[in-house]
């Protein structure tokens, strides 16, 4: 008997050190806004507003907490000594880029937090989580330990949930989490097909690979995740992302494709072997025909797709079809805006488009899809999670007040060395773990 299930979205709450340091080579938006003055308060409120709109529509909306930044334990591991004030002064003087890296609020993009396999797909019928090692970027490679603690604090019942450590943090097993993973199915509670998208084959130097920008996800990492999660060949498809797309600024597959249910919405340049990918999915998809919504380069040039983040949108079930939740930038790019008007009139599962303002995140290269981790849960599993992280009207009001009390409305690169900022962050996070009922998850709390 198939159990009823929902796809819950767990959005990253933007952290108090949200800034524009331009740390992500291959992420065009991140590099183009380097050294701009950020507004952490506005960023967090924009993220909360997006969550609230979706929760108000009846979607299960959860929250993943920000991380402690600047991260003093990492600076100590890099040889900076003394008390915390002295450490911040020393790193700001010696190498401001390192300070920017350990101060990044990049954990807000929870599509990179982990890969999640629903219980309907796994051998032991538990929901499996593997935090992404994010080894391609130093500032993100320090996230997975706290991410793992957060996930265990939320999904703690071992009879329903299985947690794995991140893969070895080396380039051969570079893993970027759910940003390179999507699941297709007839219904959420039915066994589905998990699409793992990789950029290169690490142990085969002759295999196709991008030339300008690095491929962050390897086939070896994707296969390892599938093994850890107990997925059979019937539940997994491995597809290579088009190297030309990576070189055009598509640093994760969720910048060029998004799936939901039996619908795959993608650009024609997304996959290296498009026909084989679609055939492999359809062969494994039970109970439904694959609805492939293909966007041609004539309709939307890949440069416009990257500039607008058309595909970094959330694709959500509605009563009469699917809703595409797009960033506001989609209405600022003519080809994309025109395409969206045509899309809702066409014969596809996508029947509605709604615009969301996540501009503070977009300037660092993260749209609506980057900000959320999808977790399919049946009714028993949903009942077993820590309900303190599920957004309600009361929690929204409390978190809004919390942000307004603790977040600055301006943050520049020079501010990262301010020892008061670290104190402000810790005070805020200590209060947040109480609000969400997470217990002690941060290094300063342990």
UniProtKB/Swiss-Prot annotation:
Keywords: Arginine metabolism, Hydrolase. The active site is at residues 176, 252, 370. One of its GO terms (molecular function) is N-succinylarginine dihydrolase activity. Pathway: Amino-acid degradation; L-arginine degradation via AST pathway; L-glutamate and succinate from L-arginine: step 2/5. Substrate binds at residues 21-30, 112, 139-140, 216, 254, 364. InterPro entries: AstB_sf, SuccinylArg_d-Hdrlase_AstB. The keyword Hydrolase applies. Transmembrane segments: none annotated. Gene3D superfamilies: Succinylarginine dihydrolase (3.75.10.20). Pfam families: AstB. It catalyses: N(2)-succinyl-L-arginine + 2 H2O + 2 H(+) = N(2)-succinyl-L-ornithine + 2 NH4(+) + CO2. The keyword Hydrolase applies. One of its GO terms (biological process) is arginine catabolic process to succinate. Belongs to the succinylarginine dihydrolase family. Catalyzes the hydrolysis of N(2)-succinylarginine into N(2)-succinylornithine, ammonia and CO(2). Homodimer. This is N-succinylarginine dihydrolase. It comes from Marinobacter nauticus (strain ATCC 700491 / DSM 11845 / VT8).
């Amino acid at each position: 008997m198939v159990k009823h299930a929902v796809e819950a979205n767990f959005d990253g709450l933007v952290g108090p050190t949200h800034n524009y340091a331009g740390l992500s080579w291959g992420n065009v938006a991140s590099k183009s806004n380097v050294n701009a003055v950020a507004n952490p308060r506005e960023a967090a409120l924009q993220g909360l507003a997006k969550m609230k709109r979706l929760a108000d529509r009846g979607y299960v909306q959860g929250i993943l907490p920000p991380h402690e930044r600047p991260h003093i334990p990492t600076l100590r591991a890099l040889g900076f000594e003394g008390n915390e004030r002295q450490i911040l002064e020393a790193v700001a003087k010696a190498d401001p880029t390192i300070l920017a890296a350990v101060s990044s609020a990049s954990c807000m993009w929870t599509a990179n937090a982990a890969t999640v396999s629903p219980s309907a797909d796994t051998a032991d019928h538990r929901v499996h989580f593997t935090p992404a090692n994010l080894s391609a970027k130093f500032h993100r490679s320090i996230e997975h330990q706290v991410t793992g603690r957060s996930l265990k604090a939320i999904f703690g019942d071992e009879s329903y949930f299985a947690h794995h450590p991140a893969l070895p943090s080396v380039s051969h097993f570079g893993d970027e989490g759910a940003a390179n993973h999507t699941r297709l199915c007839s219904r959420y509670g039915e066994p589905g097909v998990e699409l793992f998208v990789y950029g290169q084959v690490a142990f085969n130097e002759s295999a196709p690979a991008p030339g300008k920008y690095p491929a962050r996800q390897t086939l070896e990492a994707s296969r390892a995740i599938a093994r850890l999660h107990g997925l059979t060949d019937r539940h997994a498809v491995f597809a290579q992302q088009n190297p030309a797309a990576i070189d055009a600024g598509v640093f994760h597959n969720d910048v060029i494709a998004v799936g939901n249910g039996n619908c795959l919405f993608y650009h024609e340049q997304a996959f290296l072997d498009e026909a084989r990918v679609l055939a492999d999915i359809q062969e494994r998809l039970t109970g439904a025909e694959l609805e492939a919504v293909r966007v041609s380069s004539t309709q939307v040039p890949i440069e416009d797709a990257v500039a607008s983040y058309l595909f970094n949108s959330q694709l959500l079930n509605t009563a009469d079809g699917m809703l595409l939740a797009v960033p506001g930038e989609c209405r600022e790019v003519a080809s994309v805006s025109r395409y969206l008007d045509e899309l809702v009139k066409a014969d596809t599962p996508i029947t509605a488009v709604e615009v969301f303002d996540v501009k503070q995140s977009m300037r660092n290269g993260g749209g609506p899809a980057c900000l959320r981790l999808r977790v399919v849960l049946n009714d028993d599993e949903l009942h077993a999670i820590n309900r303190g992280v599920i957004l309600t009207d009361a929690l929204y009001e409390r978190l809004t007040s919390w942000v307004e009390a603790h977040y600055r409305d301006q943050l520049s690169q020079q501010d990262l060395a301010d020892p008061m900022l670290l104190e402000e962050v810790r005070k805020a996070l200590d209060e947040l773990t109480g609000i969400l009922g997470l217990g002690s998850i941060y290094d300063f709390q342990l």
